[in-house]
Amino acid sequence: MTKTQDYFANLTGTLATMPAGDLAIAVGVEHRKEYGEFSPDALAQSGGSTDLAAGPTSGGYSLDEVYAEVQVPLLADVPFAQELTLSAATRYSDYDTFGDTTNSKLGLKWKPVDSLLVRSTWAEGFRAPDVSNLYGGASQTFSFYTDPCDTAFGAARGNARCLQDVPVDFRQPANDADGIANGPGTQTPIPFVAGANPDLTPETSESVTLGVVFSPSFAPGLNLSLDWWTIRIENTIVPDTETQVLDDCYLRGIEARCNASTGSRFVRDADGQITSFITTPINVGHVETEGFDFDVNYRRTTDWGTFSASWLSTYISKLELKTDDLEDNPPQQLNGLSVGTGANFRVRSNLNLGWERGSWGISWGMRYYSGLKERCNFDDLCSLPDYSAPWTGGQRLRLNERPSTTFHDVQVRYQAPWNASISLGANNVFERYGPPMFSQPNSGYSYYGGYDIGRFLYLKYQQKF
């Protein structure tokens, strides 16, 4: 159950009339309360069902906000400045959980001539931890991890801290027939616990965009736009992991990670075996991405009907993820890679062609996904068993290259005179399937969930009253 109470007031209007236009402002205040609750029954909480045990969630937070926006027309209808407009906004937010934050935005629009628009923005942002991050119920998990004190595969085996906590012949237990780890990244034989963290703070971001829009006078109905953007998110909220906690304790000597009383923490018995492990989300690391958006729209009316075309493409030039604050640990470069958290396509592109005449319309669409590379564990399945690139830092990686995929869609529609619309269509007309990817299990199959699964036919009726 979720509950939101929101009280707000705002005022918009013109503060003054300037030579280039009206000086517009907007101000407002808001008070909001968020509450969430989830109460699994006793059987689910005990782990007696077919699922793992899940604890109850209950909690909320409140905040007060005030904001102001202004739009200032600097120039208009003069040579090389048909329009020059500056916009600015700022918002102050005060949360009863982590405190307060102020975030601002600046924007500039410039039209040197009627057919060309140049636009740019700079903005700050934040994402506050939600109820599940702060107060989510603890749930069981059978995690995969590497104990650094394991005498066969542990990177800290034999150091003083390990010898203090485990026997000299310590082996990490495993959830298999042998009961002993036979490699790094072994699954725990007993359930660990993943919980929430009431001490989380917001993620913060900074973004910059710069773009142009061209509407040539020699081609009425044609609009082209190109935008460059970059976004960096700091203090990201990420799941803490058992391996990270243990490495911090035994490899990096961070004492607080060895004896934590809150947050992520673990307990060993007299034989050195971990009998309890709790992990929580933490604020750490960053995400940085950069890319381009390209958009083409064309519409022309003729005696044979109205023809339209729309082509929207995104090219990602950088996607970087860092889930720790260790200077000697480089960030992960994920652009063009398929990993367990998702498929990071370098290029996504959608093309739509349409025709309309009277009450009838036809559209054809194409959806393009660029190829991907994924980690490969077996040489005989790797198309790139010895891959190296600047982003690998000199490492040789075993990768599998998966091809690009394009899906086609078609629709025929009729606008009925009784204010209704009838559509007959098919998504993935040619019944195309994306490539299997071993890093993207979906419903038990190695298939990225964003791809179509077979052809989809539909008949749709919409009635307006």
Please describe what each predicted stretch is.
Residues 54, 123, 136, 140-141, ...:
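C-terminal beta-signal and terminal closure region of outer-membrane beta-barrel proteins
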Residues 234, 317-318, 366-384, 413-465:
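C-terminal beta-signal and adjacent terminal beta-strands/loops
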Residues 54-157, 161, 193-219, 229-231, ...:
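Structural signature of Gram-negative outer-membrane beta-barrels, strongest in the C-terminal barrel
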Residues 131-224, 277-292, 343-346, 452-455, ...:
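Outer-membrane beta-barrel signature, preferentially recognizing the C-terminal barrel domain
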Residues 15, 29-37, 74, 90-96, ...:
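Transmembrane beta-strands of outer-membrane beta-barrel pores
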Residues 1-85, 324-351:
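Outer-membrane beta-barrel transmembrane domain signature of Gram-negative proteins
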Residues 27, 223, 227-376:
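Gram-negative outer-membrane beta-barrel transporters
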Residues 16-23, 75-84, 115, 155-161, ...:
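Short loop/turn motifs that connect adjacent beta-strands in outer-membrane beta-barrel proteins
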